[in-house]
C-alpha cells in the first residue's frame, strides 16, 4: 500500500462512503442544504449540494488534503518552485495572467516584465492586422487567419474563440488546423485567398511533426498561388522558442512570439498562443479573459480549503473516483457557445492526471485521472443521459450554464434552464417503484403489466452533480471558469502525489510514430516490429486490403 491509502483518513473515507444516506434523505433532513453547500466567487456560482456528502464527508476530504500538504503545494506552484520534477521545470501559467505590479521569479529572474512585454507586442500586432495596416504581398489587408498547432496550441485557442463568438469585433475570420490528415488543411485552403491570408504557426520547437507538416503545406500552397519566398514574412508569423528555425523558414524575427519552458501546452492559451483569440475579440477583451483567470488564481491561492472552489470540486472528483469507483466524469454545457469545453477539459484533465506512478516512482494503488467526456445540453438528454440516469456506472456530472443568454429569443433560454435544473434534480432524486406505479395507476394495463413497466421506469437517483452558473458568458467569466478547472485538476494531482505537468505517454506515441514513418518509406517490407505492426505497415504500403 502507498502512504496515501495507508493513512487513517483514507481508511475513514473508505468506511464513510458506505454510510452516506440517499441524497433524498439528505435534502429532506436539511432545508438549508443548498445555502450551506454553495459558493460564489470570481463571477461563478457553484451549487455542490447534489453530492453524496455530509459535513463529515467534507471534513474528512479536507483533512486528506491537509495531510497531502495541499496548501504548501499550491504555494510552491505560485512561487515558481520546480514542481514538474521529471522535466525539472517550474509551472507558472498563472504568471501569464499576473498583473504588471507583481514579481514572479523563475530560474532566478523576474518573468513578469517579459510577460508584459509579450502582451504589448501582441497588442501592436493585433492593432496592425485589424486596422488594415498590415498588408499582404499584393497590398491587400488581411481577412483570414489560419492558426496551425496541435494539442494545447490548437484546442485552447479554438475553444475559447468559439466560446467568445459574441465578442468577435475585428471582422476577421479564423480557421484552425491541427490534424496531420491532409484533408483538414486542404479543405481550409479551398476557402482562402493567399493575398489576404495570414498563418500563425505555433510550436515550441518549430518541429512538431503535425504542425510543421501543415505549415510546409500552407507555404507550398502560398508559393504556388503567386507568393514568393520574400513574401512569406508578410503571411506567416510564429509562436515558438526556436527563432533560428522560424527565420530560416522565412518568418521575420520581429514577428516571432516567445514560448517558455515554464508553460505547458495545455496551459498556454493565456500566452501568445492566444493570438488567434486576440485577433478575433481584440486585446481589451483578451486582457479581460486574463483578468478573470487571475481572479480565480487569487481565490485559489488564498481561500481556505473549506471555501475554495477549485479545492471543493477537486476533492469531490477524487471522492467518487477513489471511493465509489467512478471511472469517468461528464461535463454538460447548457450554452451553445460553450459546446467545446468538454473536449478542452478532457485534454486538460486526462493529459495532466493520466499517470500511474507517484513523484518518487512508486506505482499507485488507487485510481487517478478519470475519463472526461460530455457535450452540449439539451442534445445529450436525447442520447447518453439515459445511461446517466439508469446505467450501472456512477458518473458524476458538472452542469454549466449562464443565467442570461446572448440570444434571448422567446422562451428558448427558459426552456434551456428548466432542462438543466430538471436534469440535476432527476439525477439526484430518481424515481422509486411506488412513484412509477402511481404514474401508471390510471392506465388500462393489468396489475402484472403495471408492475413490469414500473420496474423499467425506476431510476435509483443519488447520482451526484455540480451546477456552475454565471450571470452571462463574458471573457472574464470564461477566464475564471477555465482557471477553475485548471486548479481543480492540480488539486487532484497534488493529493495523488503525481506529476500533473508532464506527458510521457504523448512523447512515446510521437517517437514510435516517427519510427513507423521511416519504415513506411523504406524499400523493403517491414519485418523488425511485432507481427501486427509489420502487417499493418505492409498493407498500407500496398494501398489496398
From Swiss-Prot:
The keyword Chloroplast does not apply. It is an enzyme of class 5 (isomerase). GO terms for biological process: gluconeogenesis; glucose 6-phosphate metabolic process; glycolytic process. InterPro entries: G6P_Isomerase (IPR001672), G6P_Isomerase_C (IPR023096), Phosphoglucose_isomerase_CS (IPR018189), SIS_dom_sf (IPR046348), SIS_PGI_1 (IPR035476), SIS_PGI_2 (IPR035482). It catalyses: alpha-D-glucose 6-phosphate = beta-D-fructose 6-phosphate. Pathway: Carbohydrate biosynthesis; gluconeogenesis; Carbohydrate degradation; glycolysis; D-glyceraldehyde 3-phosphate and glycerone phosphate from D-glucose: step 2/4. It is found in: Cytoplasm. The active site is at residues 351, 382, 510. Keywords: Cytoplasm, Gluconeogenesis, Glycolysis, Isomerase. The keyword Ribonucleoprotein does not apply. Its EC number is 5.3.1.9. GO terms for cellular component: cytosol. One of its GO terms (molecular function) is carbohydrate derivative binding. Belongs to the GPI family. Catalyzes the reversible isomerization of glucose-6-phosphate to fructose-6-phosphate. This is Glucose-6-phosphate isomerase. The gene is pgi.
Amino acid at each position: 500500500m502507498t502512504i496515501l491509502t495507508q493513512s487513517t483518513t483514507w481508511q475513514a473515507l473508505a468506511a464513510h462512503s458506505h454510510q452516506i444516506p440517499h441524497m433524498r434523505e439528505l435534502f429532506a433532513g436539511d432545508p438549508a442544504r443548498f445555502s450551506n453547500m454553495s459558493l460564489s466567487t470570481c463571477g461563478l456560482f457553484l451549487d455542490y449540494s447534489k453530492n453524496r456528502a455530509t459535513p463529515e464527508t467534507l471534513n474528512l476530504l479536507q483533512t486528506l488534503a491537509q495531510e497531502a500538504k495541499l496548501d504548501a503545494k499550491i504555494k510552491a506552484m505560485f512561487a515558481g518552485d520546480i514542481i514538474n520534477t521529471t522535466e525539472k521545470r517550474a509551472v507558472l501559467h498563472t504568471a501569464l495572467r499576473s498583473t504588471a505590479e507583481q514579481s514572479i521569479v523563475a530560474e532566478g529572474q523576474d518573468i513578469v516584465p517579459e510577460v508584459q512585454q509579450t502582451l504589448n507586442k501582441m497588442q501592436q500586432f493585433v492593432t496592425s492586422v485589424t486596422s488594415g495596416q498590415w498588408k499582404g504581398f499584393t497590398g491587400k489587408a488581411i481577412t483570414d487567419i489560419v492558426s496551425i498547432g496541435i494539442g494545447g496550441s490548437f484546442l485552447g485557442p479554438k475553444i475559447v474563440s468559439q466560446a467568445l463568438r459574441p465578442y468577435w469585433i475585428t471582422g476577421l475570420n479564423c480557421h484552425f488546423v491541427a490534424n496531420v490528415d491532409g484533408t483538414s488543411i486542404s479543405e481550409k485552403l479551398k476557402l482562402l485567398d493567399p493575398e489576404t491570408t495570414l498563418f500563425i504557426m505555433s510550436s515550441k520547437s518549430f518541429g512538431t511533426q503535425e504542425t510543421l507538416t501543415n505549415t510546409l503545406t500552407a507555404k507550398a500552397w502560398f508559393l504556388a498561388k503567386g507568393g514568393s519566398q520574400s513574401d512569406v514574412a508578410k503571411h506567416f508569423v510564429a509562436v515558438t522558442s526556436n527563432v533560428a528555425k522560424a527565420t530560416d523558414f522565412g518568418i521575420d524575427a520581429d514577428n516571432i512570439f516567445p514560448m517558455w519552458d515554464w508553460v505547458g501546452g495545455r496551459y498556454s492559451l493565456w500566452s501568445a498562443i492566444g493570438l488567434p483569440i486576440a485577433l478575433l475579440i481584440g486585446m481589451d477583451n483578451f486582457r479581460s479573459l486574463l483578468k478573470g483567470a487571475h481572479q480565480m488564481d487569487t481565490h485559489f491561492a488564498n481561500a481556505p480549503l473549506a471555501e475554495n472552489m477549485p479545492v471543493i470540486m477537486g476533492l469531490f472528483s477524487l471522492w467518487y473516483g477513489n471511493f465509489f469507483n467512478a471511472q469517468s466524469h461528464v461535463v454538460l454545457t447548457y450554452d451553445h457557445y460553450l459546446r467545446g469545453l468538454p473536449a478542452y477539459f478532457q485534454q486538460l484533465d486526462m493529459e495532466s492526471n493520466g499517470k500511474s506512478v507517484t513523484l518518487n516512482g512508486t506505482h499507485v494503488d488507487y485510481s487517478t485521472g478519470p475519463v472526461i467526456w460530455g457535450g452540449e445540453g439539451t442534445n445529450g438528454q436525447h442520447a447518453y443521459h439515459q445511461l446517466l440516469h439508469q446505467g450501472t456506472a456512477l458518473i458524476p456530472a458538472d452542469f454549466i450554464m449562464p443565467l442570461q443568454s446572448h440570444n434571448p429569443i422567446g422562451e428558448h433560454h427558459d426552456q434551456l434552464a428548466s432542462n438543466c435544473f430538471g436534469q440535476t434534480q432527476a439525477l439526484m432524486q430518481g424515481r422509486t417503484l411506488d412513484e412509477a406505479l402511481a404514474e401508471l395507476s390510471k392506465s388500462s394495463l393489468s396489475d402484472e403489466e403495471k408492475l413490469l413497466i414500473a420496474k423499467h421506469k425506476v431510476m435509483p437517483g443519488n447520482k451526484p452533480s455540480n451546477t456552475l452558473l454565471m450571470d452571462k458568458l463574458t471573457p472574464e467569466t470564461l477566464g475564471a471558469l477555465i482557471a477553475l478547472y485548471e486548479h481543480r485538476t492540480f488539486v487532484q494531482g497534488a493529493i495523488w502525489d503525481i506529476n500533473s505537468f508532464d506527458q510521457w505517454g504523448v512523447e512515446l506515441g510521437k517517437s514510435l510514430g516517427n519510427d513507423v514513418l521511416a519504415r513506411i518509406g523504406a524499400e523493403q517490407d517491414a519485418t523488425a516490429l511485432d507481427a501486427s505492426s509489420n502487417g499493418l505497415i505492409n498493407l498500407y504500403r500496398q494501398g489496398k486490403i
